[in-house]
């Protein structure tokens, strides 16, 4: 895969209909919301989780496309496995005197061993070389600053969170059944957003990509993941979520040809009717100002 040599900045536009895009565990799993503005929020962690799930499903068992942070993973065990595969015994003194005459802490890498472990992790795990990771626990593979960074997603206009009462025609225990006299019903609640269009921003650094081994092929796969991640992550709780657009600004250099905020300002998302609550993507217009683009900037609009 070819080396990434161009900076990229991008905008993600996705929506939710009758679902909870990202519950807040500190607020009874209600949809995340900015209490001052009423804007809906989706964390960067939530978006990266969906990318990881997409890669796991579509790149299963392909070398170099495993996922480090996955469900039920024991991260320290994975880090220790790196050194086993590298043939580095962390209970013996380092092979090179440059790394120390003795092992400072048994079971923990030191000196250039950490660099070897970090390189192995980047080569093996897509999410490590993409988003970075803190791997300084356990056997210690250091830290990786990811070339791809995401912001929180924020709804274009304020959202409304609705609470619905639901009924299950069953109970969990015999005691509950006896208490209800055989009626066997369980009441519950479900929180949804009727409709929300969310906007997130992302950044790709070629300098950091060269350090982690994140390639142009990895970038293509990442954009494919953004476009399709909701298709493979359906649940009743999340309702209908769709990636509507991925708008990419490709720079003609590693350092970039324009500030990211100036490029993002060119993407204008406005309600068609500001007085009527939006209930579909058609209730918004999306315009990308491509007039008088800074020299070296190329705009690509990917649609889901």
Model-assigned labels for residue ranges:
Residues 1-304:
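RNA-binding basic/glycine-rich loop and surface signature characteristic of RAMP-family CRISPR effectors
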């Amino acid at each position: 895969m070819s080396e990434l040599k161009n900076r990229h900045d991008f905008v993600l536009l996705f929506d939710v209909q009758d679902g909870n895009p990202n519950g807040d565990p500190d607020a009874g799993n209600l949809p995340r919301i900015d209490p001052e503005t009423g804007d809906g929020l989706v964390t960067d962690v939530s978006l990266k989780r969906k990318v990881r799930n997409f890669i796991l499903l579509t790149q299963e068992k392909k070398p170099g496309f495993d996922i480090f942070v996955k469900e039920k993973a024991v991260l320290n065990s994975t880090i220790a496995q790196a050194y086993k595969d590298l043939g580095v015994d962390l209970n013996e003194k380092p092979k090179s005197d440059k790394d120390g005459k003795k092992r400072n802490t048994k079971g923990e890498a030191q000196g250039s061993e950490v660099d070897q472990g970090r390189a192995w992790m980047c080569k093996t795990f897509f999410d490590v070389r993409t988003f970075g990771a803190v791997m300084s626990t356990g056997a210690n593979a250091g830290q990786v600053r990811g070339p791809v960074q995401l912001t929180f997603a924020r709804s274009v206009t304020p959202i409304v969170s609705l609470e619905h009462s639901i009924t299950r025609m069953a109970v969990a225990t015999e005691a509950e059944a006896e208490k209800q006299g055989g009626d066997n019903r369980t009441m519950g609640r479900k929180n949804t957003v009727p409709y929300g269009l969310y906007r997130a921003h992302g950044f790709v650094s070629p300098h950091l990509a060269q350090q982690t081994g994140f390639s142009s092929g990895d970038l293509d796969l990442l954009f494919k993941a953004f476009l399709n991640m909701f298709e493979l992550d359906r649940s009743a709780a999340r309702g209908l979520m769709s990636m509507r657009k991925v708008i990419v600004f490709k720079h003609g250099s590693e350092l970039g040809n324009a500030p990211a905020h100036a490029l993002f300002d060119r993407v204008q998302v406005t309600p068609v009717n500001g007085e009527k609550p939006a209930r579909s993507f058609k209730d918004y217009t999306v315009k990308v100002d491509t007039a008088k683009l800074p020299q070296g900037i190329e705009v690509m609009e990917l649609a889901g």
